[in-house]
């Protein structure tokens, strides 16, 4: 679950997550993906670059 907004500046970033993830899995360069998606602020870039999906690992503990 990607946060809806950047923690630092508040820009909405969640719509870019699915495309970023799909293109990253294909082996594309993260810099190029983020540039293409229009994510220019380094705080927003950090949100996508450092996010790790752990929701599937946490589901058994509900």
UniProtKB/Swiss-Prot annotation:
A GO term for molecular function: DNA binding
Keywords: Cytoplasm, DNA-directed RNA polymerase, Metal-binding, Nucleotidyltransferase, Transcription, Transferase, Zinc
Note accompanying the cofactor annotation: Binds 1 zinc ion.
Record localization: Cytoplasm
Positions annotated to bind Zn(2+): 6, 9, 43-44
Pfam family, one: RNA_pol_N
Source species, domain of life: Archaea
Main location class: cytoplasm
Cellular component annotations (GO), alphabetically ordered: cytoplasm; DNA-directed RNA polymerase complex
Cofactors demanded by this protein: Zn(2+)
GO biological process, one term: DNA-templated transcription
EC number, as in UniProt: 2.7.7.6
Subunit structure of this chain's protein: Part of the RNA polymerase complex.
NCBIfam families on file: PRK04016.1
Summary of the function given for this chain in its UniProt record: DNA-dependent RNA polymerase (RNAP) catalyzes the transcription of DNA into RNA using the four ribonucleoside triphosphates as substrates.
Family matches, as HAMAP family: RNApol_arch_Rpo10 (MF_00250)
Protein name (database record): DNA-directed RNA polymerase subunit Rpo10
Record organism: Methanoregula boonei (strain DSM 21154 / JCM 14090 / 6A8)
């Amino acid at each position: 679950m990607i946060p809806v907004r950047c923690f630092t500046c508040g820009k909405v970033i969640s719509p870019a997550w699915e495309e970023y993830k799909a293109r990253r899995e294909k082996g594309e360069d993260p810099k190029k993906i983020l540039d293409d998606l229009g994510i220019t602020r380094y705080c927003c870039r950090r949100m996508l670059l450092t996010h790790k999906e752990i929701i599937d690992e946490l589901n058994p503990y509900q």
